[in-house]
Amino acid sequence: MRIGQYQLRNRLIAAPMAGITDRPFRTLCYEMGAGLTVSEMMSSNPQVWESDKSRLRMVHIDEPGIRTVQIAGSDPKEMADAARINVESGAQIIDINMGCPAKKVNRKLAGSALLQYPDVVKSILTEVVNAVDVPVTLKIRTGWAPEHRNCEEIAQLAEDCGIQALTIHGRTRACLFNGEAEYDSIRAVKQKVSIPVIANGDITDPLKARAVLDYTGADALMIGRAAQGRPWIFREIQHYLDTGELLPPLPLAEVKRLLCAHVRELHDFYGPAKGYRIARKHVSWYLQEHAPNDQFRRTFNAIEDASEQLEALEAYFENFA
């Protein structure tokens, strides 16, 4: 699959997730088989660009793979400026967020709230596409509410504005993450436009990935929550798509290696004073199937020292040896 001038190595994309797809996680997903990874959502508000949080979220030239940054906002000029700044910092693809259902984002008329206003959508897409010389992509939901699904209209508008690829999450904004994703809307969009269409939502295992590709005709898949604590899902899915065979479960020793390496990277990236806090949620996700009684996770979350976290993980896995 191609996005503009860039050829992806496969059809699996790690979704942008606020507070999750930081540089350590993106790098790990890429190493585990993702063909593309997308940064956390970056605000287009220039007042926050110099904050520590924004600087950490920006991509850098030495990151592996095709460097892709997602931006969010409602002002066309600010969005264009944000795109330019991120390209200057190393972004090779700009993705526009019109899919986030969070209230704090929607209250600012950003994210999926924009789907209610196609004229504003058109203005934003036009400004951003004209502002940069790299491919611009768009992520949306199927609409604002089940009774207001307008993804076909938005998709056609996006193609007309020069968007190079479109990701669709198979829920409306009103659905949040409740219920099941539906793929009829994604299938309809794929039949309507000629730009690449990427299916997103509830793609949790290799069999589901194959089924969604076959049903929708999508060019690629974007995987988000299913990769939390399981970044090797990209390798599992790609192997199944290539061979029709399922890989055996990842050995516990490999889970330990990946988890401990991930935690060390978080400590290094954020610094010991903040890294241990960020690591807590990732450790919880990794250990969901190994620590069902939550006792270790409760103990781990009380640790306030980076080195003690690693010692606790070593001791935890020794109990399974």
UniProtKB/Swiss-Prot annotation:
EC class (word): oxidoreductase
Catalyzed reactions: a 5,6-dihydrouridine in tRNA + NAD(+) = a uridine in tRNA + NADH + H(+); a 5,6-dihydrouridine in tRNA + NADP(+) = a uridine in tRNA + NADPH + H(+)
The EC number(s) this enzyme carries: 1.3.1.-
GO MF term set: flavin adenine dinucleotide binding; FMN binding; tRNA binding; tRNA dihydrouridine synthase activity
Active site: 100 (proton donor)
One Pfam family here: Dus
Reported cofactor(s): FMN
Residue positions binding FMN: 16-18, 70, 139, 200-202, 224-225
GO biological process, alphabetically ordered: response to radiation
Keyword Transmembrane: no
Keywords: Flavoprotein, FMN, NADP, Oxidoreductase, RNA-binding, tRNA processing, tRNA-binding
Domain of life according to the entry: Bacteria
Disruption phenotype: A dusA dusB dusC triple mutant exhibits a complete lack of 5,6-dihydrouridine modification in cellular tRNA, whereas each single mutant exhibits a partial reduction, compared to wild type.
Annotated function: Catalyzes the synthesis of 5,6-dihydrouridine (D), a modified base found in the D-loop of most tRNAs, via the reduction of the C5-C6 double bond in target uridines.
Similarity comment: family membership: Belongs to the Dus family. DusB subfamily.
UniProt miscellaneous comment: DusB and DusC together account for about half of the 5,6-dihydrouridine modification observed in wild-type cellular tRNA, and DusA accounts for the other half. These three enzymes seem to act site-specifically on the tRNA D-loop and contain nonredundant catalytic functions in vivo.
HAMAP family hit by this protein: DusB_subfam (MF_02042)
Name of this protein: tRNA-dihydrouridine synthase B
Species in which this protein is naturally found: Escherichia coli (strain K12)
Gene: dusB
